[in-house]
Amino acid sequence: MTKDVINNMSTHMDKTIDALRKEYQRVRTGRASTGLLDEIKVDFYGTPSPINQVATLAVPEPRTITLQPWDAKMIPVIEKAIMNANLGLTPANDGKVIRLNIPPLTEERRKDIVKQLKKLAEDAKVAVRNIRRDAIDELKKQEKDKKISEDDLKRAEKEVQDVTNSHVAKIDEVFVHKEKEVMEV
């Protein structure tokens, strides 16, 4: 009974960490990453499509992203979508390939990005703690309904706290790694 609650809680916490990592991919760090373009939709013959479904994305150099549309007529549409996404990137094309040069970040901008990353990490920690609270509430309900003993409840609460602590540590680890990447010149 308690194992199910703890496994379910752990799965939800893992999803929270995955969501944080995905969110961090979208943050511009001064280094090229195709993750910057994940949320951009392009009008592909009347259908809004993710940019990676209308072009091949590549990172040939640390500060350059290239997009090679499968249909050359899509170049202006893709460029417009990138401009409208307000990423601070200006596309340049040679008729076949679109190039996005990632400008280096200023020290002030790096610090702002780190603040943004810290807030995202704190939000993830709050989500993990809410998941912990829900799990403990479920365990207390089971104890009240006499499905588990008081000793089982105490043991399970300790295990819930241990799992929570390990997930909070993972969030800190993800944050520190991304912070290093952003502050690297």
From Swiss-Prot:
One term of GO molecular function: ribosomal large subunit binding
Localisation: Cytoplasm
One GO cellular component term noted in the UniProt record for this chain: cytosol
Keywords carried by this UniProt record: Cytoplasm, Protein biosynthesis
InterPro entries: Ribosome_recyc_fac, Ribosome_recyc_fac_dom, RRF_sf
Domain of life of the native organism: Bacteria
Any single GO BP term: cytoplasmic translational termination
Gene3D superfamilies recorded: 3.30.1360.40, Ribosome-recycling factor
Region (Disordered): 141-161
SUPFAM superfamilies in the cross-refs: Ribosome recycling factor, RRF
UniProt family annotation: Belongs to the RRF family.
NCBIfam families per UniProt: frr
Physiological role: Responsible for the release of ribosomes from messenger RNA at the termination of protein biosynthesis. May increase the efficiency of translation by recycling ribosomes from one round of translation to another.
Protein name as annotated: Ribosome-recycling factor
Phylogenetic classification of the source organism: Bacteria, Pseudomonadati, Thermodesulfobacteriota, Desulfuromonadia, Geobacterales
Gene name of this polypeptide: frr
